[in-house]
C-alpha cells in the first residue's frame, strides 16, 4: 500500500504546487496530485505536514565529512556514518570532497572511494556520494587556507590524470587556482574529461580568472573565502565570481565564514539560478566541541568555529541550517532558497546519469525529499521513502 504525504506546498524543482498529495511506494514516487484535482486520501498510511513545503532532498557539492568521520578515510563505515547523519539533516546526495595531502595518500583515498561508489546502492535511508570534489592540490600558496603548503602542486595535467584515473572517473568537480602556470590548459583538459572546474583558493587577478573561465571553468569555490579581496582597480577573482553571470558561486552561509551583509551582496549578484549553498563541513559536524581531523590536519572546534592554527578549517554547518540562515539574512522566498541547494548544484554537476534527480521530485524518481517549515528549518527528511533520523 502506498504511503501518502500531504503538505501546504510542494516544490518539485521547477514549480510550486499548493495542497499537494505525494504518493510513495517501494521507495519511489508513485504520483503527484493536488487536493484541487484529486480527492483527499483515505489511507492509514498518511503523513501530513500542514504548514510545511515538500521539496527535493539537498545536494552538497562541497563537504569533507561529518559524524566524526572524514571522507578521505574512504571506508564503508565512514561513509555510512556520514550518510546517516547527512540524511537526518535533509541532504540526500553529496560530493565527497578531498583536502590537499601527500599525492600517494590522495591516490589511495580516491581509489578506495571509487570502489565504494561503484557498488550498487542499497535501500538504507542514508545520503550517498554521487561523485568526488577535488579540493587541492592545484591551489595557491598565498590563499591555501589550511591546505598544507608542502603538498600543493603546480597545474599539472599528468598528475590530474593520475588522480582522475585513481577515482575511476568519479571526479565531478575540481577547485583550481587560475594564476597557476598552466591553469587554463588544465581547465580545458579537465573539462574534456567531464570534470567541472571551479576557481578558488586563489590570489588571481581578474584577467587570470577570465582566462580560466574561457578555458572551461564554470563555478567559484566558497566565494569570498580564500580569495583575493575585491579592489576597485583590480577586482580580482572575487570581482569576476560576482559579476560573471554564467558562473556558479558557492557560499558557506554560517555567519562565521560570511556575514549577513556579504550573503546579501552574493545573493543579489548571483540571483536565484547561479548561487549554490555549501557547507564545507568537516568531521566535527554533528559532534560536540573538541579536536577532530580534516584530512591529515588536527582541527579544534569551539562554539561552532573550526580552526587549525588560528585559520578557519571548514565548518560544522548543515545545509538545513544554511537554508534557514539564508532566508533570515536575505528575506528571500523559500522557493528561492531551495534552488540554491537542489536544482542549482544539480545543474552544476549534472549529467544524463543524474538529471533530473537529485534536485527534482517527479513520478518514478527515488522518493528523496524533505519537509521544510516556513522559516527554512527542517521538519522531516525522507530517503527512498523512509524517514531519516
Predicted regions and their residues:
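Active-site glycine- and acidic-residue-rich loops that bind
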Residues: 102-108, 179-181, 198-203, 252-269
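Divalent metal-dependent hydrolysis catalytic cores, especially in the metallo-beta-lactamase
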Residues: 64, 80-109, 126-140, 167-179, ...
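Residue-level marker for buried hydrophobic side chains located in beta-strands
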Residues: 57-59, 198, 275-278
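N-terminal metal-binding scaffold of metallo-dependent hydrolase/deaminase domains
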Residues: 1-40, 382, 386
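C-terminal cap of metal-dependent C-N hydrolases
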Residues: 355-389
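Active-site-adjacent C-terminal substructures of enzyme catalytic domains
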Residues: 208-341, 348-355, 372-377
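Divalent metal-binding pocket/active-site signature
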Residues: 134, 141-157, 161-236
Amino acid at each position: 500500500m502506498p504511503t501518502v504525504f500531504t503538505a501546504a506546498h510542494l516544490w518539485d524543482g521547477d514549480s510550486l504546487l499548493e495542497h499537494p498529495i505525494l504518493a510513495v511506494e517501494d521507495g519511489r514516487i508513485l504520483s503527484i496530485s493536488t487536493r484541487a484535482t484529486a480527492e483527499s486520501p483515505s489511507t492509514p498510511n498518511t503523513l501530513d505536514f500542514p504548514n510545511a513545503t515538500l521539496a527535493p532532498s539537498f545536494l552538497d557539492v562541497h563537504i569533507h565529512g561529518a559524524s566524526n568521520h572524514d571522507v578521505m578515510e574512504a571506508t564503508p563505515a565512514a561513509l555510512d556514518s556520514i550518510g546517516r547523519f547527512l540524511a537526518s539533516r535533509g541532504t540526500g546526495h553529496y560530493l565527497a570532497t578531498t583536502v590537499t595531502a601527500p599525492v600517494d595518500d590522495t591516490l589511495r583515498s580516491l581509489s578506495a572511494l571509487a570502489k565504494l561508489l561503484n557498488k550498487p546502492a542499497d535501500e538504507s535511508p542514508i545520503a550517498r556520494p554521487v561523485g568526488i570534489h577535488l579540493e587541492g592540490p592545484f591551489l595557491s600558496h598565498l590563499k591555501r587556507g589550511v591546505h598544507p603548503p608542502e603538498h600543493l602542486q603546480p597545474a599539472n595535467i599528468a598528475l590530474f590524470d593520475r588522480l582522475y584515473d585513481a577515482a575511476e572517473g568519479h571526479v565531478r568537480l575540481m577547485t583550481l587556482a587560475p594564476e597557476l602556470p598552466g591553469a587554463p590548459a588544465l581547465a580545458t583538459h579537465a573539462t574534456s574529461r567531464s570534470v567541472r572546474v571551479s576557481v578558488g583558493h586563489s590570489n588571481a587577478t581578474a584577467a587570470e580568472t577570465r582566462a580560466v573561465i574561457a578555458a572551461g571553468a564554470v563555478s567559484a569555490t566558497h566565494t569570498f573565502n580564500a580569495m583575493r579581496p575585491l579592489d576597485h582597480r583590480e577586482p580580482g577573482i572575487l570581482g569576476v565570481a560576482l559579476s560573471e553571470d554564467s558562473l556558479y558561486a558557492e557560499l558557506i552561509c554560517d555567519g562565521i565564514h560570511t556575514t549577513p551583509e556579504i550573503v546579501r551582496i552574493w545573493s543579489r549578484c548571483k540571483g536565484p539560478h547561479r548561487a549554490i549553498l555549501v557547507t564545507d563541513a568537516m568531521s566535527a559536524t554533528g559532534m560536540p566541541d573538541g579536536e577532530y581531523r580534516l584530512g591529515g590536519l588536527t582541527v579544534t572546534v569551539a562554539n561552532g568555529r573550526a580552526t587549525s592554527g588560528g585559520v578557519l578549517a571548514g565548518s560544522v554547518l548543515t545545509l538545513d541550517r544554511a537554508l534557514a540562515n539564508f532566508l533570515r539574512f536575505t528575506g528571500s522566498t523559500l522557493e528561492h532558497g531551495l534552488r540554491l541547494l537542489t536544482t542549482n548544484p544539480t545543474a552544476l554537476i549534472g549529467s544524463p546519469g543524474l538529471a533530473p534527480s537529485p534536485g527534482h521530485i517527479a513520478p518514478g524518481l527515488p522518493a528523496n525529499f524533505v519537509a521544510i517549515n516556513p522559516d527554512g528549518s527542517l521538519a522531516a527528511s525522507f530517503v527512498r521513502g523512509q524517514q531519516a533520523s
